[in-house]
């Protein structure tokens, strides 16, 4: 990429995805020890693990408003600072209720980062490389997940009653680094114009990003703002925005009813259900992280070449096949291929939904409601993540794996129909031209 500053800013903001992934997956190595330490019932245990996801719901709900009021840069700074508070507080908690408070704070940060980071990157990135740059956020999520699994395995092999505290507390180190780096980025030029009417500052930022296209981009943003002022801004939940709202809702809904967060949160438990020993199950979870990373790299490298819709189609087919095989393995109790089937599922997710979701949601809304649209898509994602993660231990214990994974497979069949018949291609389209492109 020619513009090093654009890449540097995008990478810096995408590091919030690393914190997102690390904090999301690190709990998988700690959850069983936490249950044993505080003698938690299955219901309270499920709540203690899912409480972070409930935090993501509120973080996503208010993330767009917060990013509009304070700016993308300040919002990202506070995300990093509160990630640090959550990591340290969770690690030193002496009872489950204190633990849940700090995990909830971490969830707020995850939810907010899933709104503000893709939003910021999409607003500074040129159309030709926007998919790649926004997808760096997802790459960092899966890199964080892989590091969490490796960290969990290393701390588990060291043994000791407090290894779970180290698993959670380690998140504080990258949190501090990210917080400091946010001070070095510039504010989004679109936010400067739309929220502050600061055209001069926006022009300076656009010149830093790409001097050759700065004037054209500035004119396009100002034209969009002028049209919006002339026509008036409709309420978010209005007929005018119904189609992008539906698109965002469905891609976020299908992301979670694939079962991805159930697998990530409870990976060791899923492998133990299939008969693996505890240490082997935790090590297999490291394989999940590595598979996720490799295929996310592939998806990120292809998203601006083949487009969002093609990757979603490939991922949907992979989902259906792998989930059906997992369900069959539980039904027949023949688990020889279970590890491979789960890895295939992760690969399908990484190259499809994983690479596409945050890019797609950040693109499909007009400038005047982009923050609200990003927040809505993220909110939908986290509401269903919280529900599925909370009920997964109960249903897996009561019914086993077969009906759960059949349900996920059927839902991915529905996703395939969504991709085929509804999803527009957004590759290479300028943000200000997106409204015309997707026909709403």
Q: What is the role of each PLM region?
A:
Residues 198-201, 213:
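Short phosphate-engaging motifs
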Residues 1-198, 205, 226-440:
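Alpha-helical transmembrane bundle of multi-pass membrane proteins
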Residues 206-228:
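Cytosol/matrix-facing amphipathic helices and coiled-coil assembly/linker segments
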């Amino acid at each position: 990429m020619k513009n090093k500053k654009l890449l540097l800013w995008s990478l810096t903001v995408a590091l919030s995805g690393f914190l997102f992934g690390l904090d999301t997956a690190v709990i998988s190595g700690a959850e069983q020890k936490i249950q044993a330490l505080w003698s938690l019932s299955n219901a309270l245990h499920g709540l203690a693990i899912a409480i972070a996801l409930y935090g993501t719901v509120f973080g996503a709900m208010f993330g767009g408003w917060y990013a509009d009021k304070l700016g993308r840069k300040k919002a990202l700074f506070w995300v990093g600072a509160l990630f640090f508070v959550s990591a340290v507080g969770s690690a030193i908690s002496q009872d489950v209720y204190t633990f849940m408070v700090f995990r909830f704070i971490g969830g707020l940060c995850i939810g907010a980062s899933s709104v503000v980071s893709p939003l910021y990157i999409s607003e500074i990135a040129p159309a030709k490389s926007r998919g790649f740059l926004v997808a760096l956020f997802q790459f960092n999520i899966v890199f964080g997940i892989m590091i969490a699994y490796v960290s969990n395995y290393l701390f588990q092999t060291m043994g000791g009653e407090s290894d779970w505290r180290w698993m959670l507390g380690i998140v504080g180190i990258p949190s501090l680094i990210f917080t400091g780096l946010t001070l070095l980025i510039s504010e989004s030029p679109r936010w400067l114009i739309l929220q502050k009417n600061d055209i001069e500052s926006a022009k300076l930022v656009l010149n830093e990003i790409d001097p050759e296209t700065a004037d054209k981009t500035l004119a396009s943003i100002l034209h969009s703002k002028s049209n919006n002022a002339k026509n008036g801004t409709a309420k978010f939940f209005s007929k005018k925005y119904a189609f992008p709202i539906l698109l965002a809702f469905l891609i976020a809904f299908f992301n979670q009813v694939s079962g991805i967060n159930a697998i990530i949160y409870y990976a060791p438990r899923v492998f133990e259900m299939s008969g693996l020993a505890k240490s082997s199950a935790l090590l297999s979870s490291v394989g999940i992280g590595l598979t996720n990373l490799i295929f996310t790299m592939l998806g990120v490298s292809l998203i601006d070449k083949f487009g969002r819709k093609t990757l979603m189609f490939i991922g949907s087919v992979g989902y259906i096949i792998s989930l059906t095989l997992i369900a069959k393995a539980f039904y027949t109790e023949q688990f020889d291929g279970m590890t491979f089937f789960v890895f295939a599922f992760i690969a399908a997710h990484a190259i499809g939904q994983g690479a596409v979701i945050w890019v797609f949601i950040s693109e499909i809304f007009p400038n005047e409601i982009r923050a609200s649209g990003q927040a809505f898509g993220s909110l939908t994602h986290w509401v269903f993540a919280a529900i599925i993660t909370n009920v997964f231990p109960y249903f897996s214990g009561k019914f086993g794996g077969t009906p759960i994974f059949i349900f996920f497979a059927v839902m991915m069949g529905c996703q395939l129909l969504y991709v085929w018949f509804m999803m527009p291609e957004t590759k290479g389209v300028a943000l200000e031209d997106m409204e015309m492109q997707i026909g709403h």
